[in-house]
């Protein structure tokens, strides 16, 4: 070994001896932390510089930014608008809570009760106006309060979603007051009658509602009164039939209708009619003849004076019983070999046809 090599090895040894005491004084945890930081720095340097680390090319942020498409202002606004629209459309719907339903029912009840009070006040004002007109004789006083309020009443009664609320709050009682005859004996305005009856026809009225409101008596009056227009009378009669059917337990199906039948003897009836006519002729008095003249129409009376026959007038008769048919039902499609062959009528027709054929052949 040369002198130069000995001097270099001595220098390295001295350097190592100088560094060793410095490392021995360092805390082990501090030494570990520095080692981790050094490793992280080396890894980051290797990523940034291809000369360091594994030799892979480093990622350039500028190149990635340049590869993305640059959006113009119109496209960006359109995308923002589409995103907001999707957010609105796919937004979950808020479910109606029980509290909201209770508040809605309470609002509907208050609305119907206010209308009920308004109807009662309007009816009372019209009654007061008519009483004042009867007392003073002033024909200028006209009861118009109900007519003014009628459009609002019809609007509420025609709402299907308020039908149960109307019936539960007994608005039918106010309807009955409006339909009742006035103090002077006249009926309400025709427009009131027509509108209210049309509304009643669409409401699901039950027996308990009729008992509570007392509406049934007024509707029966309209079905029997001669002062009511024929169309309204028929509608009132229809309502009475519909309301009465569940009370008596009748079905609305015509097939379920029971028809009372009774055997009818024509010969017996004819003999009885002859006997009754003979007895009535003997017992008839002049007073009865005078009474019959009263019930005759002017046309029949004029025909009787001229000793001429009068055309019979149309009468409406009701029958309690339907006659029992004594004709055997024969199938319309019946052919040869059925019960039709054995009937006397068929035999006579067949003999006549055969006789005609023999005559033609001769």
UniProtKB/Swiss-Prot annotation:
Bias-annotated ranges (Basic and acidic residues): 1-16, 28-38, 70-89, 287-297
Region of interest called Disordered, as start-end residue ranges on this chain: 1-105, 277-297
TFIIS N-terminal domain mapped to chain residues: 173-250
Predominant cellular place of this UniProt entry's protein: nucleus
Residue pairs linked by disulfide bridges in the UniProt entry: none
Keyword match Metal-binding: no
Keywords: Nucleus, Transcription, Transcription regulation
GO process annotations (BP): poly(A)+ mRNA export from nucleus
GO CC annotation, single: nucleus
Matches recorded under Pfam families: Med26
Lineage: superkingdom: Eukaryota
Subcellular location: Nucleus
PROSITE patterns in the cross-refs: TFIIS_N
Function: Transcription factor involved in RNA polymerase II transcription regulation. May function in both SPT15/TBP post-recruitment and recruitment steps of transcription.
The family this protein is said to belong to: Belongs to the IWS1 family.
Protein name: Transcription factor IWS1
Naturally occurring in which organism (per UniProt): Kluyveromyces lactis (strain ATCC 8585 / CBS 2359 / DSM 70799 / NBRC 1267 / NRRL Y-1140 / WM37)
């Amino acid at each position: 070994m040369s002198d130069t090599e000995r001097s270099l090895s001595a220098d390295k040894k001295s350097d190592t001896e100088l560094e060793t005491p410095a490392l021995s004084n360092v805390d082990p945890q501090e030494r570990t932390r520095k080692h981790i930081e050094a490793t992280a720095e080396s890894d980051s340097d290797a990523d940034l510089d291809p000369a360091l680390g594994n030799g892979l090319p480093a990622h350039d942020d500028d190149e990635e930014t340049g590869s993305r498409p640059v959006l113009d202002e119109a496209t960006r606004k359109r995308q923002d608008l589409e995103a907001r629209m999707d957010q609105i459309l796919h937004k979950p719907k808020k479910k109606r809570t029980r509290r909201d339903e209770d508040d809605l029912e309470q609002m509907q009840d208050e609305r119907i009760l206010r209308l009920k009070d308004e109807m009662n006040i309007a009816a009372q004002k019209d009654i007061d106006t008519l009483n004042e007109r009867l007392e003073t004789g002033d024909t200028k006083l006209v009861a118009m309060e109900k007519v003014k309020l009628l459009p609002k009443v019809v609007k509420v009664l025609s709402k299907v979603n308020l039908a149960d609320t109307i019936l539960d709050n007994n608005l039918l009682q106010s309807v009955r007051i409006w339909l009742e005859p006035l103090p002077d004996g006249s009926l309400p305005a025709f427009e009131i009658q027509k509108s209210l009856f049309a509304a009643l026809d669409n409401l699901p009225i039950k027996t308990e509602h009729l008992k509570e409101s007392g509406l049934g008596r007024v509707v029966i009056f309209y079905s029997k009164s001669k002062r009511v227009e024929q169309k309204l009378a028929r509608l009132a009669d229809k309502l009475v039939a519909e309301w009465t059917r569940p009370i008596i337990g009748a079905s609305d199906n015509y097939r379920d209708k029971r028809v009372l039948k009774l055997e009818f003897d024509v010969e017996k009836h004819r003999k009885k009619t002859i006997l009754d006519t003979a007895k009535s002729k003997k017992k008839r008095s002049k007073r009865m003849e005078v009474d019959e003249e009263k019930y005759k129409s002017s046309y029949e009376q004029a025909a009787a004076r001229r000793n001429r026959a009068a055309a019979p007038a149309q009468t409406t008769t009701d029958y309690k019983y339907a006659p029992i048919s004594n004709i055997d039902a024969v199938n319309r499609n019946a052919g040869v070999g059925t019960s039709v062959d054995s009937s006397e009528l068929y035999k006579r027709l067949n003999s006549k046809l055969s006789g005609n054929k023999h005559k033609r052949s001769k």
